[in-house]
Amino acid sequence: MPELPEVTTVINELKETVLNKPLDQVQVNLRKVLKNIDPQLLNKQLKNQFFTDIKRKGKYIIFLLSNGLYLVSHLRMEGKYFFEERGSKFNQKHVLVEFHFDDGSQLNYHDTRQFGTFHLYEKLEQAAQLNKLAFDPLEAGFDYRKIFQKAQNSKRKVKTFILDQTVISGIGNIYADEILFASKINPETMVDQLTIKEIEILCKNATKILAKAIVMKGTTISSFSFKKDHTGGYQNFLKVHTKKDQPCSVCNQLIVKKKINGRGSYFCLNCQKITTKVSTKLNP
């Protein structure tokens, strides 16, 4: 699933190709991707309008329209956007939504798994899925002290905790593994056992790693592509994710893979030891 760096990379590419181009037609080839509007009404609302800006919240893409509406897109597992110039040939298979512009070019939403979603809103406050999202590590409101407070009230493993989009938004399985490795935290550590200093280090690494991944245009492990024939580059910098049975870059011990709450997790047992918080209370 595309995570914060991949979604940001997609948005950066879209901004270069589709802003301020009048829409002539929106063609929906698979009805189920529209969650709160039918294809005919979507076409009516977008026809003759244009995208004035494109923003991100967590892993969501938000298209701002010239008529004040908001089109909210989530790529889910395999969603991709491909821009096509007028007259260009492309494979129509798996193109679920087509945004046709009046200059003959078009933006295609491509999704082999068909899990992606679209919502249209008059106001973003109506988008419940956005309202429940926490700050992401690149936002000004991201505060390790607030994360620590949430951790103190949680009985989950740290890997599961940081994947919760109501705790930290934008992080998925790939970057969770990398952030925990950089922070020397075992993914099975109970999060309420982490000290505030450990949470601070984790949050700083989250910001650092996600920012670097954006510079590298995301991570391509299986299929991520931000435009035709272009893939990300951060996979070349991964330390543990997908590295099962390969030597750790720090200590040379072999990286292990284990399912944690249903998610394949990669880590180094030597560099990422489970520790418990030492009590500062005096013995009676």
Curated annotation (Swiss-Prot):
GO MF annotations in UniProt: 8-oxo-7,8-dihydroguanine DNA N-glycosylase activity; class I DNA-(apurinic or apyrimidinic site) endonuclease activity; damaged DNA binding; DNA-(apurinic or apyrimidinic site) endonuclease activity; zinc ion binding
SMART domains: Fapy_DNA_glyco, H2TH
Cofactor note: Binds 1 zinc ion per subunit.
Transmembrane segments: none
Record-annotated active site: 2-3, 59, 263
Domain of life: Bacteria
Catalytic reaction equation(s): Hydrolysis of DNA containing ring-opened 7-methylguanine residues, releasing 2,6-diamino-4-hydroxy-5-(N-methyl)formamidopyrimidine; 2'-deoxyribonucleotide-(2'-deoxyribose 5'-phosphate)-2'-deoxyribonucleotide-DNA = a 3'-end 2'-deoxyribonucleotide-(2,3-dehydro-2,3-deoxyribose 5'-phosphate)-DNA + a 5'-end 5'-phospho-2'-deoxyribonucleoside-DNA + H(+)
Binding site for DNA: 94, 113
Pfam short name (any one): zf-FPG_IleRS
GO terms of biological process kind: base-excision repair
SUPFAM superfamilies: Glucocorticoid receptor-like (DNA-binding domain), N-terminal domain of MutM-like DNA repair proteins, S13-like H2TH domain
Span of zinc fingers (FPG-type): 239-273
InterPro entries registered for this protein in UniProt: DNA_glyclase/AP_lyase_DNA-bd (IPR015886), DNA_glyclase_Znf_dom_DNA_BS (IPR015887), Formamido-pyr_DNA_Glyclase (IPR020629), FPG_cat (IPR012319), MutM-like_N-ter (IPR035937), Ribosomal_uS13-like_H2TH (IPR010979), Znf_DNA_glyclase/AP_lyase (IPR000214), Znf_FPG/IleRS (IPR010663)
Subunit record text: Monomer.
Annotated function: Involved in base excision repair of DNA damaged by oxidation or by mutagenic agents. Acts as a DNA glycosylase that recognizes and removes damaged bases. Has a preference for oxidized purines, such as 7,8-dihydro-8-oxoguanine (8-oxoG). Has AP (apurinic/apyrimidinic) lyase activity and introduces nicks in the DNA strand. Cleaves the DNA backbone by beta-delta elimination to generate a single-strand break at the site of the removed base with both 3'- and 5'-phosphates.
The name this protein goes by in its record: Formamidopyrimidine-DNA glycosylase
